[in-house]
Amino acid sequence: MASENPFRSILKALEKPDGGEFGNYYSLPALNDPRIDKLPYSIRILLESAIRNCDEFQVKSKDVEKILDWENTSPKQVEIPFKPARVLLQDFTGVPAVVDLACMRDAMNNLGGDSNKINPLVPVDLVIDHSVQVDVARSENAVQANMELEFQRNKERFAFLKWGSNAFHNMLVVPPGSGIVHQVNLEYLARVVFNTNGLLYPDSVVGTDSHTTMIDGLGVAGWGVGGIEAEATMLGQPMSMVLPGVVGFKLTGKLRDGMTATDLVLTVTQMLRKHGVVGKFVEFHGEGMRELSLADRATIANMSPEYGATMGFFPVDHVTLQYLRLTGRSDDTVSMIEAYLRANKMFVDYSEPESKTVYSSCLELNLEDVEPCVSGPKRPHDRVPLKEMKADWHSCLDNRVGFKGFAVPKEAQSKAVEFNFNGTTAQLRHGDVVIAAITSCTNTSNPSVMLGAALVAKKACDLGLEVKPWIKTSLAPGSGVVTKYLAKSGLQKYLNQLGFSIVGYGCTTCIGNSGDIHEAVASAIVDNDLVASAVLSGNRNFEGRVHPLTRANYLASPPLVVAYALAGTVDIDFETQPIGTGKDGKQIFFRDIWPSNKEVAEVVQSSVLPDMFKATYEAITKGNSMWNQLSVASGTLYEWDPKSTYIHEPPYFKGMTMSPPGPHGVKDAYCLLNFGDSITTDHISPAGSIHKDSPAAKYLMERGVDRRDFNSYGSRRGNDEIMARGTFANIRIVNKHLKGEVGPKTVHIPTGEKLSVFDAAMKYRNEGRDTIILAGAEYGSGSSRDWAAKGPMLLGVKAVISKSFERIHRSNLVGMGIIPLCFKAGEDAETLGLTGQELYTIELPNNVSEIKPGQDVTVVTNNGKSFTCTLRFDTEVELAYFDHGGILQYVIRNLIKQ
């Protein structure tokens, strides 16, 4: 059990410059350990957290030593516990998290406890940004029209989240129409340094969205996790992570005139993809850092998932402090942040000699080498220099189908297709732009590129250029601040004139919420098999993500989005070909509309003001009239509607008592599914559309839901009945029980019946039979999806026996009370002669004190086979979760006892 922190002796007072104290803090220098000076700054944040939270139970002294000895331990894949300071959610992932909290309150109440104790123990911020679609564009009424449609579609989900914002303490819900979660986090939510009841410590955050990494640009350690990990963090539990290697990325020089942060981030993404940084931190340093604005850094940090790193970290320096003042943080707060970080060796001063920091590996980029570029047509790291774009496009048309190929026959590459657009004859060719979107927190958080785009629009309008009316243009700012500085600059009217009117404040086109393109354009593309293009200032461009009909999708800076919209095609050499013809008949080139760095800097200086941030965020939680008119119950216990197909009370705590059930072995269990290698979380719990013949579809139709209103599994994550039916429902899943047949079915072994996985699981349950899963290597790889653990638990799966597990999925299985077992090295189901038709018994002691992390466990089958597996409960804390039947049950019982 927990004991007093053994590091209390290094708790020091932090003095204010003018007398008095800011508070107390755990002083890293007071350890008197020379290894600290060599640690990357990102690792120092992990070290401080381990020291502050050390209780010899959840976090142990040996964990602190592992981090201190990072230079030697990081190559060895050692695991450490980490307790982030706060949690960040968006609405798609936030709904199931709030469902779980509401259900826990009911369980507390039923057990005679105080249900109001179920509150997040760390601050939780939930920003509703994933639901708005670009139904209406090129209209100054677009914001209101799109918001009304958003509320019509999502009224039930929004009402539930609004109830949660009132019912739970320590939970802030930012209503729809306010901005994009990561930009709001950067401009407002991030603390950088916490002061909680007089204890100072670094801000850190985990979020249920991969681009949580954007906050690393502000010197706040943050990355994306799965839902169960996020819920566990909310409730005070540590998350388990491998102590990462750190790639040092040195920046030198400065960007040349006309280069943008987007050009830089696409260059960095390509370099890091080539280097290989999966599972690692990347830490930026060097004298070139002085030349990067905070917004530039945030752009680079945002795309960490695209270059594969856990984080792209920028330590706090003077630029960070300037940004904090600009965005309305008080002078006292900024003074405290600087004093704390300097005192604890977490502040970088580039006017001083570079520190002795050691990195796992190193890269270097001279900023002067960055050139204008885009990325595409199908992957974020496929960078194309602008000067090579036309040639690259033609090679893509030629190449066989792949990441850089469309296999368009030579004779068809130059064909022009005529179509009727609002009574006018128009033409489309391969490469023509049909969507041009200034979108995504990656770029809309950066005033330089946003105002740069507005300057391009002004120059284009002054010269008489126009955007073709069938191109779907849109501007979706990540916060209301963008609207204010565009208005202050007087440049928004030029964007409007070109069709880039504001369509909403949310993720929109970047996550595929691009809405329909004009019917005539869509027909021309489909009927003639055209490779149409989208150009967007987003962070992902995988085929089919932006829009089903744009097979070529290019990531570009906001100014380049405007330029390509004006050109109307990606099949252009901006250096030699005109972008269009001006009002005097003169040819206009790219260089005629491109602003200089000086022009951009001047308009940023005069238009982006601290008062804008204060005015925007003072009212951030108030919401609009539609949000305020949503009527919700005032109680702290949720009133579940049994008819709802979006929000449903899950059965996790049914029959729960105050006594932990204790460890349970598995007796005579059938193998529900028998898998090979690389079963991903998308195989286990798909997020996409609900197939018309699936158990989930049947459930919805029985409740009167029309097929066109099925929506996706992702949107229905608040309903366990649908998600359980969607477990193992991937149409591409391969189950050895089916002997070569592909699809979401299995065999009910006693009868030989071929059934859907859900129906087979329910049949076993009705017969009183446990089930297990057999699998190969890398079970649970891919997205850290919590329903990939919740779903199997609801199907009655008691254990998974595999060659290896993906790290996050293993911890999610533990959190849901499922036993993870690994075959011994060199063994698997095949080498052991297991067919999956056997009955399996897993022998475990009845007392958790007799079980040790990582111990050997014997598995016996009914045909006399016996083999040994490694029990993948890796820590004593995980054994405690198992003893209680899962992490949420563990938390409930502990809160009642307190």
From Swiss-Prot:
- Cofactor, how bound (note): Binds 1 [4Fe-4S] cluster per subunit.
Q: Which residues bind substrate?
A: Q90, D209, S210, H211, R540, R545, R703, S784, R785
Instruction: Give, as one word, the top-level EC class.
Output: lyase
Protein keywords: 4Fe-4S, Acetylation, Cytoplasm, Iron, Iron-sulfur, Lyase, Metal-binding, Mitochondrion, Tricarboxylic acid cycle
Q: What is its EC number?
A: 4.2.1.3
Any idea what a deletion of this gene does?
Reduced cytosolic and mitochondrial aconitase (ACO) activities by 70 and 20 precent, respectively. Increased tolerance to oxidative stress mediated by paraquat, a superoxide-generating agent. Slightly higher production of CO(2).
For this protein, the record's Gene3D superfamilies field holds: 6.10.190.10, Aconitase, domain 3, Aconitase, domain 4
Q: What is its main location?
A: cytoplasm
Cofactor needs: [4Fe-4S] cluster
Q: Does the keyword GTP-binding apply?
A: no
Pathway listed for it is: Carbohydrate metabolism; tricarboxylic acid cycle; isocitrate from oxaloacetate: step 2/2
**Which chemical reaction does it catalyze?**
citrate = D-threo-isocitrate
The record's family statement is:
Belongs to the aconitase/IPM isomerase family.
- Subunit structure as annotated in this protein's UniProt entry: Monomer.
Role this protein plays: Catalyzes the isomerization of citrate to isocitrate via cis-aconitate. Contributes to oxidative stress tolerance. May have a role in respiration.
Q: What is this protein called?
A: Aconitate hydratase 1
* Native source species: Arabidopsis thaliana
Recall the taxonomic lineage recorded for the source organism.
Answer: Eukaryota, Viridiplantae, Streptophyta, Embryophyta, Tracheophyta
Gene symbol here is ACO1
